[in-house]
A protein has these predicted regions:
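Active-site neighborhood of HAD-like aspartate-dependent phosphohydrolases
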Residues: 1-44, 144
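Non-catalytic pre-domain segments flanking phosphatase-related domains
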Residues: 1-8, 171-197
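Conserved Lys-Pro-Asp/Glu-containing loop-to-beta segment of HAD-superfamily phosphomonoesterases
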Residues: 5, 95-128
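Short catalytic/ligand-binding loop motif for oxyanion handling, primarily in non-cytosolic enzymes
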Residues: 15-18, 65, 72-76, 108-111, ...
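Substrate-recognition element of Asp-dependent hydrolases with the DxDx(T/V) motif
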Residues: 45, 50-78, 84
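Hydrophobic/aromatic residues located in beta-strands of well-ordered beta-sheets
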Residues: 63, 100, 135-137
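A short, structured active-site edge motif that brings together acidic residues
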Residues: 67-71, 77, 81, 85-110
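Acidic, Mg2+-coordinating phosphoryl-transfer loop and its flanking beta/alpha structural elements
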Residues: 115-161
């Protein structure tokens, strides 16, 4: 059977972005938005457990990275690719080799179905909750157990197995979420952003 598609956001899912940018925003009054600092995205630390999780999930999923970058920071686009190559490799042994999508509207990629793991509902992430496309948005950390260092990997591995016997990927997510009493995502319209976002 064909492997299901898994799309992973970078910021606050693979990369520990927000904690670093919030710290910079509190220290520096000269910067309106810390995400516009050239080079800022190149050296951010990975989220705990993220690198190992991607490698493990690549055995069950076709994995893609789906992220956005600030329009006012052209280096961010290149820096994100450099970050991914640093942690996952630059050749065809990488689980994400030539599977990187950078777009301001993440909904453009959902029509082929799949799961998007993203921490925030905006930039088209919540549009992935679409039964017609058999796509679903799983909000990273909305349920504190659904993080890399907790139960997210086992949740996604279970979804992959259940998907083999259900009609849709969305149904598989629903079955696994119900079985473990997982909260898949929060409110799609109300979300507390950092003060500088």
């Amino acid at each position: 059977m064909t492997q299901p598609k898994l799309f992973l956001d970078m910021d606050n899912v693979l990369v520990d972005t927000l904690s670093v940018l919030n710290e910079i925003a509190m220290r520096q009054q000269s910067v309106e938005k810390p995400d516009q600092i050239p080079g800022i995205f190149r050296d951010l630390p990975p989220m705990p457990g993220a690198i190992e999780a991607v490698k493990q999930l690549a055995t069950e999923y076709d994995i893609y990275v789906l992220s956005t970058a600030p329009w006012q920071n052209p280096s961010a686009w290149q820096d994100k690719l450099i970050w991914l190559q640093h942690y996952f490799g630059e050749d065809n042994t990488s689980p994400i080799y030539k599977r990187i999508i950078l777009a301001h509207d993440k909904s453009v990629a959902h029509f082929g179905g799949g799961i998007l793991v993203d921490d925030r509902p905006y930039h088209g992430a919540s549009d992935w909750d679409d039964p017609d496309a058999d796509s679903i948005w799983l909000q990273f950390g909305a349920d504190p157990r659904l993080t890399w260092s907790n139960e997210l990997v086992s949740f996604l591995l279970d979804v992959s197995q259940v998907q083999d016997v259900t009609d849709t990927l969305r149904e598989a997510v629903a079955v696994v979420a119900e079985r473990g009493h997982f909260y898949v995502h929060g409110d799609k319209t109300e979300f507390d952003k950092a003060h500088w976002e």
